[in-house]
Amino acid sequence: ADARQGLRALAAALAAGPDGQPDRPDQADRAPWRARLAGLTAAWRADRDRERASDAVPIAPQRVLAEIEAALRPDDILICDASLASGWGGVYLEQRSSGRRVLSPRGQAGLGYAVPAAIGVAAARPAARVVVLSGDGALGYAAGEMATLTEQALPVTVVVLNNRSWGWIRWYRRINFGRAWEEEDFGDVAFADVARGFGLAAQRVTEPGPLGAALAAALDAPGPALVDVVTEAWQTPITAHRRAVGDGMDGVDRTPAPGYGG
């Protein structure tokens, strides 16, 4: 099928009213609907921007996305790993130019996707800077591929949202069962040290103030780099999670599982 002809036919059909005649202002007044939609959009953007401006410690993932957005150039490419990283990238980063600049494995549920995907993107588009957004759990699946980044001197910056847990599972269990389990929480892995062992330039960031400079330095590095960002464990981009516990995460028991630092 010809996509152009199909789109033209679809546009013609959408321009017609329910009786097949061209839609006219006297047939339907959409102004109230448009006004309501504009109001909801404005309110959502205000909430999003407030969260993105957070100075909280540990660092809010929303702030990380704001800093990434500020650091990206129009031709840069962001690759989000599975689970919460895809949600953070999809909700809190505003794409300001056309084209497929943000990639994620939605529907595939494949943790460890982002670093191997970045290798492919960097090989296919050698002039582009590539940024990986990964949780600490997901990076554990593909940490060995940092050796490939170094061997090929690929311009890939890995940003780790280090919440020291399986974040999605932690939320699911707390919402559905009212408690945490020990296997949800990790020890505090020093990903910057791990990355240096593979030959990457690396920094660990624990407060939001230095985050922008750390990202800029990583993106300007002559080879691959990693920024390990220590983030708040009880943050989520998933609306259903927030609704389950109340907006603002009120009522969530933030106590880590027994014997673990969370």
For each of these PLM feature ranges, what is it?
Residues 208, 214-262:
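Glycine/aspartate-rich loop-and-adjacent alpha/beta segment that forms the canonical ThDP
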Residues 9-12, 89-94, 114-116, 143-146, ...:
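Short acidic, glycine/serine/threonine-rich loops at helix termini
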Residues 38-116, 121-122, 127:
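Active-site diphosphate/adenylate-binding microenvironment
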Residues 1-36:
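Glycine-rich, acidic loop regions that bind phosphate or pyrophosphate groups
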Residues 5-7, 86-87, 109-111, 139-140, ...:
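Short gly/pro/ser/thr-enriched loop/turn and capping motifs at secondary-structure boundaries
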Residues 5-6, 12-16, 124-214:
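Conserved thiamine diphosphate
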